[in-house]
């Protein structure tokens, strides 16, 4: 039988607590589950946005190198994937901060304890962007189509969510839940 909403939430919570907080920590011989949880929450609330590692480090009260180590661990454990900035003109384009996406929106929701239905959520745009980015990644992996992936943003706030560079040929994607433009 189909699990109830409460049953689904319980499954996600168990996944987050067992897979993320036990397996990932054991894998890297890391002791700080509170630190890992805090970093994951910060990333979850910033999906699709550029993330300042200095801000994350200050928020969790650790040094930037430790944050980088945790992020590397989370990427190797297939929890998150990073996206660097694309630039051909460093004076007008932002490249210093990466974006992070979760390979599973359910895990993201479990981390921040957000299980409301779509029409009751204020983060639907972030969920949509995360979903489409990951589906694109899975599709290209399945088809063995490899390219460098970036986002593009100018200091005047113009942005493209995903730029794929394959053999010098660029392809751009913008993910919007609603027709409203930023």
What is the meaning of each model-derived region?
Residues 66:
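Residues in the helix-turn-helix
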Residues 69-79, 83-182:
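A cross-kingdom feature that marks ATP-driven nucleic-acid transaction machinery
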Residues 50, 55-58:
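A short alpha-helical element within helix-turn-helix/winged-helix DNA-binding domains
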Residues 1-45, 49-50:
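Interdomain motor-coupling "hinge/lid" segment immediately C-terminal to the ATP-binding subdomain
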Residues 27, 55, 120:
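Conserved short-loop catalytic and cofactor-binding motifs
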């Amino acid at each position: 039988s189909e699990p109830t909403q409460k049953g689904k939430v319980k499954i996600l919570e168990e996944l987050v607590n067992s897979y993320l907080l036990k397996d990932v920590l054991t894998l890297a011989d890391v002791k700080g589950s509170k630190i890992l949880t805090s970093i994951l929450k910060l990333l979850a609330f910033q999906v699709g946005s550029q993330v300042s590692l200095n801000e994350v480090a200050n928020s969790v009260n650790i040094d930037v190198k430790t944050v980088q180590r945790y992020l590397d661990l989370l990427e190797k454990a297939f929890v998150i994937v990073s996206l660097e900035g694309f630039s051909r003109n460093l004076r007008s384009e932002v490249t210093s901060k990466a974006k992070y996406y979760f390979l599973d929106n359910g895990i993201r929701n479990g981390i921040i304890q957000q299980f409301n239905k779509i029409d009751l959520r204020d983060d639907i745009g972030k969920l949509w962007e995360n979903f489409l980015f990951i589906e694109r990644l899975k599709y290209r992996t399945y088809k063995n189509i490899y390219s460098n992936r970036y986002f593009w943003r100018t200091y005047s706030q113009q942005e493209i969510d995903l730029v794929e560079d394959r053999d010098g040929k660029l392809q751009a994607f913008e993910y919007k839940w609603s027709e409203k433009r930023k």
